[in-house]
């Protein structure tokens, strides 16, 4: 399977996806990576530790989270996708379940969509991904 410019073998290999949450209320890192320079340093460290794909998320899905508008989520993830794409040669996954955010992320350079709802939340998501040719 090709993701970005890399070929991933589907048998006999394990791959590591690193998480870059750009949310102020993440349950796993509490918004540590909202700053561009700290985020880039974190991606660099994860690559050095063996990360194969970076997963960028802009909306917390912790228990009791507040639903963001597409515009709010796009404002968080698109600049980070662009800066990671410009600085590193690594496939970028976008963690979103909203088709509008996925479209913006794909335009910004995302190589994969990570939809935690499995294409069941947003009726347009499957169409957006199919038209883009990206993996999901």
How would you label these PLM feature ranges?
Residues 24-28, 60-64, 101, 108, ...:
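Conserved anion-binding
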Residues 66-94, 99, 103, 127-136:
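Alpha-helix-loop-beta-strand connector modules within alpha/beta enzyme cores
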Residues 1-21:
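N-terminal amphipathic alpha-helix/helix-capping segment at the start of soluble metabolic enzymes
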